[in-house]
């Protein structure tokens, strides 16, 4: 089995002027002083200054795709056409049935998302993210993964979400869970309005490793003392960058590699349960979104 190319992630030469995903890191660090969790508590400064934990979001912390859950909330508010809804149904069904993400699917979804937010205000999208977190995403948090984040927090370590999910949504999830922050894909905005373009590359695959490495430099972290968690083989570059890698709800390729490398595996699903709920839950999503579109058509 061939592993993803890690050469870029391990380049020992550091150019502080060209660190990857600066936009995501800058946004996250700028937002940290104002972040408070659901209890209104601001995360405490870390006691252990050189160790941190990095968590992927989709299927690692959140059951399924956080962007699709966000899409469900938007569909319920009549933001989508029938064609858009079919795309969400397909993405969710494929994600649940195959148990892994596809780079092309992620990129295609990102393009659609950028087209959707173009011309909309950042404030509006953040507010929608808050509402949809309460309505849908909060109930999709894997309890086991949530406990792992708390273990690191209790140890006085920074805990970061590292995800291709749009920064605004990722930051909302991190803040509501009392985590240190989130690195996500950053969409460009001018005067508070999204332009429909990205500031940096999609935060996915090797890009996550670049971002973690850059964050470690900024925060003075020792990557050998850090831990990373993911469900996806696409995140092997990030998992390989730290001292401790943990496969959470892993896809088949990651499970095989984790066994080969002696990485810990934690599966908060069961094979029987995953097989049983995969298709029905995808169909339920399709029914819910189709109903939303039908209501919209009736009104039109």
Swiss-Prot record:
The protein's required cofactors: Mg(2+)
Active site positions: 56 (nucleophile), 58 (proton donor)
UniProt EC number: 3.1.-.-
Family: Belongs to the HAD-like hydrolase superfamily. SerB family.
Cofactor note: Binds 1 Mg(2+) ion per subunit.
Name used for this protein in its record: Putative hydrolase ML2424
UniProt keywords, alphabetically: Hydrolase, Magnesium, Metal-binding
Organism: Mycobacterium leprae (strain TN)
InterPro entries (UniProt xref): HAD-like_SerB (IPR050582), HAD-like_sf (IPR036412), HAD_hydro_SerB1 (IPR006385), HAD_sf (IPR023214)
Residues reported to bind Mg(2+): 56, 58, 231
């Amino acid at each position: 089995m061939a592993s993803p190319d890690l050469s870029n992630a391990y380049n020992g030469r550091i150019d502080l002027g060209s660190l990857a995903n600066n936009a995501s890191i800058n946004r996250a660090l700028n937002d940290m002083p104002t972040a408070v969790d659901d209890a209104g508590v601001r995360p405490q400064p870390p006691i252990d200054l050189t160790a941190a934990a990095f968590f992927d979001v989709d299927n690692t912390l959140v059951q399924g795709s956080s962007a699709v859950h966000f899409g469900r909330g938007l569909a319920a508010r009549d933001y989508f056409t029938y064609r858009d809804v079919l795309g969400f149904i397909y993405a969710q069904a494929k994600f649940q049935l195959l148990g892994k993400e596809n780079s092309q699917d992620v990129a295609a979804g990102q393009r659609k998302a950028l087209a959707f937010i173009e011309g909309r205000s950042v404030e509006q999208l953040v507010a929608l993210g808050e509402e949809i977190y309460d309505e849908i995403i909060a109930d999709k948090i894997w309890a086991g993964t949530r406990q792992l984040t708390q273990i690191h927090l209790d140890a006085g370590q920074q805990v970061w979400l590292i995800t291709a999910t749009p920064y605004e949504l990722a930051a909302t999830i991190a803040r509501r869970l009392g985590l240190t922050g989130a690195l996500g894909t950053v969409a460009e905005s001018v005067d508070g309005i999204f332009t429909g373009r990205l500031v940096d590359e999609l935060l996915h695959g090797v890009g996550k490793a670049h971002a973690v490495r850059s964050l470690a430099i900024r925060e003075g972290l020792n990557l050998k003392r850090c831990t990373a968690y993911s469900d996806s083989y696409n995140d092997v570059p990030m998992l390989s960058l730290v001292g401790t890698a943990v496969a959470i709800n892993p896809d088949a390729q990651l499970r095989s590699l984790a066994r080969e490398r002696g990485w810990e595996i934690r599966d908060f699903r069961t094979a029987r349960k995953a097989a049983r709920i995969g298709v029905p839950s995808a169909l339920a999503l399709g029914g819910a979104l189709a109903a939303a579109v039908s209501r919209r058509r009736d009104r039109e």
